[in-house]
Amino acid sequence: MITVREDTREETLILDDGLMIQETLERLAAKEIFSRQAAYCCYVRSRLCREALCTAQSFATARIVSGDALELI
């Protein structure tokens, strides 16, 4: 499981390595869990990696593992 944060909003998700980060953000925005701007977010910050990661890659490629927390930047 991973946690994704946007400002004061937070969602915990089951990690699917094959999913693209951008697709996940688009789904969260479509369900109105996150703002519409989240769908166009280009970077997230990983708590474990401590770096900004491009959302145009899969969770596996970005080396995001269960227990990580991502913040939209």
Ranges and model annotations:
Residues 5, 45, 71:
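Residues in well-ordered beta-strands of folded domains
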Residues 6-23, 53:
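Short, contiguous acidic and Ser/Thr-rich linear segments
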Residues 16-38:
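Short amphipathic, charge-patterned alpha-helical segments
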Residues 49-71:
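Eukaryotic mixed-charge, acidic/polar low-complexity intrinsically disordered regions
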